[in-house]
């Protein structure tokens, strides 16, 4: 009898068993009744076989104490919840530490006391036969779990100089599983880490899981309606502040993208056969097909003329036009792919990434920071080459713009969405977009390509086009759109090279931070919300799938281009804007040029970016019955992530009102650094789009269409799949809650934080939430007031003790300013130019009541 894996599942309720909440689902599976021996002999078994259906009851862990979650690893591995182990190992850092997991696991299944940091070997006792200790099957399960942990997350054990967790694991295995393959692998990893130079070991451990301040079990109150015998859990890490990471230098210096030391590869041993849920198996098999080794290619021979050495031995700096567009795109793709493959996926978790600006957390996620730096470097290169040479006339500058458009098209053909987005962001930045004379000289064909490429990141229908492309092409061999250059398609087919895909990582960062913001860490008081971790796992799985796809690229580095790119001068926002104004004074700049060429697809309503208006939308796997979640569009939309990515600069030329509000330049005129990546990430509430710091322009800015990328994630190495889950919505009150965005009232920038407001929250409560997110711990709520931005000229002050949910203007944008109580009555609230996400249309999105 065979069970069909393709089955329908319906959630019917929950069960509480021993301090663990299980989601109960009914799964309808098809049973293929085998034919009789006679039928098989006659060859007619297929005709006579009966198709029967059976309904199975399935339980999956939804929430539990830390002790129970760790304890469930073994039974889950043995078959009751096939994806549980994978999700746990991927996300546990959000609610506990490696040391705690080992202590609880060994205490429960090793019958030993928790080891100290010095890893005392003598305290680990072999399995007790008196208690009917685990059989071989149980030992195999524990061995497989620990082996998977070592193989896939070896960095968890890199804790120089003593490596306490790894030594604890070695001691446990040595006494309970002597002579096993796991013991050999653990000893090998320990030897490798100990052999590293101290500096190398420290660099390997740059991004450990955040050490959480954990309360002892005795201090924790029992969960509501639950009476677990022992509650072992961690203090939830909620609403971490996410400030932008400085990426671009403030002065024109040579600063190549940082090269990061790769995490040491675990020993190449057979991986434990962790079973995955049926719905995840196709994705796994798909990802395995992507693991083909890249075909080595000979070094590229320059097909263009390079400057020759002069009499004094110096060479003239090569010009962009000397590098063919396909070569530039290939080199960008090579750089982007290498950095993306080095990204540690779980560092993208909202609870980790959004803490990077906190004191003591500067070491977090260096691989992600490297991708941010590369994105900014590409965008800066575009702006510098367009503005750096003041001797160029408009027609010559137009040729440079056309060259970059061609590079962008080649990036599209290579499925490099990261550099594609960086180039488009730079071309639509304030400093370049305003150059009327230059754009007039751009050929109509090039401009048409520019429009077509920009449509990829359009915010229409929640960035549906970019999501569809990612789903369609994420693991395909070639790009499929008609904009793919014919020669590129021909070259691909002739060489037979299979391409990878480099996504815009801001998409995932936004989604994960918003997921972290929208869903509770704990349910019923002290039970860890494991359903939230499953949804995060879906996103991280997509990252892993695309990382494996990047192995399909086969591009050789070109030394001359790499040297030229790394030596590119960096322009600050003020410098680029000044150069732009020198080329075409403000009175001559006109965004009408693009409009005259029907560039309606570039970016809608740039002027909207001047006022905070970002929308929080999202969707992950549907959890229809939960009252604790909100239904949203696919993916998360600007939340805490755009908090981190949403930096606004007080603009450079307040008189230049006709300019489109875009400037993805490295830093604002007042010296506050700002990033192309982060401004780009903001513009798309959920995957980041090309938002920009406004150069203090007025709301009369010309309208265009913001570009922003997005995408869809699915975990377990499943291919970019759906996910229509539940998260909060911005700019919409449904039921008794809503999401608002709160920024600080400052002159040199704004950082927005997403705040959940319920019908019970009064002004002091909301102010305290906003202060916590903005790290204003030393101040008191009484020192601040909450002001809603209705329009450019209209602000609404929320009364001191008013219920914010009912006092706010629900028809306007849910954008607020947290303002110090120092202004006189009647005075206008400051409003600096901002580079926020464009407001997204809410279509068919509803919030379930009582989400939190």
From Swiss-Prot:
The record's annotation in CDD domains points to:
RA_RalGDS, RasGEF, REM
InterPro entries per record = RA_dom, RalGDS_RA, Ras-like_GEF, Ras-like_Gua-exchang_fac_N, Ras_G-nucl-exch_fac_CS, Ras_GEF_dom_sf, RASGEF_cat_dom, RASGEF_cat_dom_sf
Chief localisation class:
cytoplasm
What Gene Ontology terms describe what this protein does at the molecular function level?
Answer: guanyl-nucleotide exchange factor activity
**Which stretches does the entry tag as region Disordered?**
606-627, 665-711
Return any one Pfam family short name.
RasGEF_N
Give Gene Ontology CC terms. cytoplasm; nucleus
Q: Where do the Ras-associating domain residues begin and end?
A: 736-823
Please list the residue ranges annotated as the Ras-GEF domain: 324-586
Q: What is the recorded post-translational modification? A: Phosphorylation of Tyr-752 by MET blocks HRAS binding.
Compositionally biased tracts (Low complexity)? 613-624, 683-710
Q: Which GO terms describe its biological process?
A: small GTPase-mediated signal transduction
Top-rank lineage group of the source organism? Eukaryota
Intracellular or extracellular location(s): Cytoplasm; Nucleus
Q: Phosphotyrosine occurs at which residues?
A: 752
> Keyword set for this entry?
Cytoplasm, Guanine-nucleotide releasing factor, Nucleus, Phosphoprotein
Q: Give the function comment from the record.
A: Functions as a guanine nucleotide exchange factor (GEF) activating either RalA or RalB GTPases and plays an important role in intracellular transport. Interacts and acts as an effector molecule for R-Ras, H-Ras, K-Ras, and Rap. During bacterial clearance, recognizes 'Lys-33'-linked polyubiquitinated TRAF3 and subsequently mediates assembly of the exocyst complex.
Fill in the subunit field for this protein: Interacts with RIT1 and RIT2. Interacts with OOG1. Interacts with TRAF3. Interacts with HRAS.
What protein is this chain from? Ral guanine nucleotide dissociation stimulator
Q: Which organism is it from?
A: Mus musculus
């Amino acid at each position: 009898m065979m069970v069909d894996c393709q089955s329908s599942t319906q959630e019917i309720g929950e069960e509480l068993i021993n301090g663990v909440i299980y989601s109960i689902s009914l799964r309808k599976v098809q049973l293929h009744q085998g034919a009789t021996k006679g039928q098989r002999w006659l060859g007619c078994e297929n005709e006579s076989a009966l198709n029967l259906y059976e309904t199975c009851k399935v339980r999956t862990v939804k929430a539990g104490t830390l002790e129970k979650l760790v304890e469930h690893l073994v039974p889950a591995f043995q078959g009751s919840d096939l994806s549980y182990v994978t999700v746990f190992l991927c996300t546990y850092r959000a609610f506990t530490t490696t040391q705690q997991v080992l202590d609880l696991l060994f205490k429960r299944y090793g019958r030993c006391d928790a080891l100290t940091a010095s890893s005392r070997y003598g305290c680990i006792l072999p399995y007790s036969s008196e208690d009917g200790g685990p059989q071989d099957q149980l030992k195999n399960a524990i061995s497989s779990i620990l082996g998977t942990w070592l193989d896939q997350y070896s960095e968890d054990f890199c804790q120089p100089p003593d490596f306490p967790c790894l030594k604890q694991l070695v001691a446990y295995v040595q006494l309970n599983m002597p002579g096993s393959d796991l013991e050999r692998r653990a000893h090998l990893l320990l030897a490798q880490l100990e052999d590293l130079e101290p500096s190398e070991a420290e660099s390997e451990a740059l991004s450990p899981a955040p050490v959480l301040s954990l309360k002892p079990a005795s201090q924790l109150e029992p969960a509501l309606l639950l009476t677990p015998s022992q509650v072992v859990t961690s203090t939830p890490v909620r609403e971490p502040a996410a400030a932008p990471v400085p990426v671009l230098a403030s002065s024109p210096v040579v600063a190549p993208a940082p090269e990061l030391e790769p995490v040491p590869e675990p020993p190449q041993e057979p991986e434990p056969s962790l079973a995955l849920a049926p719905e995840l198996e196709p994705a796994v098999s798909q990802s395995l097909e992507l693991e083909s080794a890249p075909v080595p290619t000979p070094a590229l021979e320059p097909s263009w003329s390079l400057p020759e050495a002069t009499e004094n031995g110096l060479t003239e700096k090569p010009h962009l036009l000397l590098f063919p567009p396909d070569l530039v795109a290939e080199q960008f793709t090579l750089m982007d792919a290498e950095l993306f493959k080095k990204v540690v996926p779980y560092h993208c978790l909202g609870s980790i990434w959004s803490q990077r600006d906190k004191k003591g957390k500067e070491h977090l996620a260096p691989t992600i920071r490297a991708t941010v730096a590369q994105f900014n470097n590409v965008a800066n290169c575009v702006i510098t080459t367009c503005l750096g040479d003041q001797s160029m006339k408009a027609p010559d500058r137009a040729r440079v713009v056309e060259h970059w458009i061609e590079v962008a098209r080649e990036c599209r053909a290579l499925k490099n969405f990261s550099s594609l987005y960086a180039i488009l962001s730079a071309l639509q930045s304030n400093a370049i977009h305003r150059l009327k004379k230059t754009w007039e000289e751009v050929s109509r064909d090039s401009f048409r390509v520019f429009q077509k490429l920009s449509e990829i990141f359009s915010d229409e229908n929640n960035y549906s086009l970019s999501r569809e492309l990612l789903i369609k092409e994420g693991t395909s061999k070639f790009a499929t759109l008609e904009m793919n250059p014919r020669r590129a398609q021909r070259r691909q087919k002739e060489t037979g090279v299979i391409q990878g895909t480099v996504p815009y990582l801001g998409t995932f960062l936004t989604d994960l931070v918003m997921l972290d913001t929208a869903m509770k860490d704990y349910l019923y008081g002290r039970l860890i919300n494991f359903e939230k971790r499953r949804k995060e796992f879906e996103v991280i799985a997509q990252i892993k799938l695309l990382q494996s796809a990047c192995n399909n690229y086969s591009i050789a580095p070109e030394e001359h281009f790499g040297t030229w790119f790394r030596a590119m001068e960096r322009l600050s926002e003020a410098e680029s804007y000044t150069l732009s104004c020198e080329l075409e004074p403000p009175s001559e700049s006109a965004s009408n040029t693009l409009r005259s060429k029907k560039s309606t697809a570039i970016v809608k309503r740039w002027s909207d970016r001047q006022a905070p208006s970002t929308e929080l939308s999202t969707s992950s796997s549907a959890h229809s019955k939960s009252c604790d979640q909100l239904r949203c569009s696919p993916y998360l939309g600007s939340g805490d992530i755009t908090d981190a990515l949403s930096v606004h600069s007080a603009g450079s030329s307040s008189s230049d009102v006709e300019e489109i509000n875009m400037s993805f330049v490295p830093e604002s005129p007042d010296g506050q650094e700002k990033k192309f990546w982060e401004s780009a990430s903001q513009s798309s509430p959920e995957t980041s789009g090309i938002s920009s710091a406004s150069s203090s322009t007025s709301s009369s800015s010309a309208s265009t269409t913001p570009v922003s990328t997005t995408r869809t994630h699915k975990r377990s190495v499943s291919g970019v799949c759906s996910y229509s889950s539940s998260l909060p919505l911005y700019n919409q009150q449904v039921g008794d809650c809503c999401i608002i965005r709160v920024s600080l009232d400052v002159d040199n920038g704004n950082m927005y934080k997403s705040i959940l407001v319920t019908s019970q929250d009064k002004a002091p409560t909301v102010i305290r939430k906003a202060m916590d997110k903005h790290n204003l711990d030393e101040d008191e709520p009484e020192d601040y007031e909450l002001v809603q931005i209705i329009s450019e000229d209209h602000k609404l002050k929320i009364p001191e003790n008013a219920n914010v949910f009912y006092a706010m203007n629900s028809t306007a944008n849910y954008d607020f300013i947290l303002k110090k109580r120092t202004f006189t009555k009647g005075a206008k609230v400051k409003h600096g130019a901002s580079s926020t996400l464009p407001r997204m249309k809410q279509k068919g999105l509803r919030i379930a009541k009582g989400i939190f």
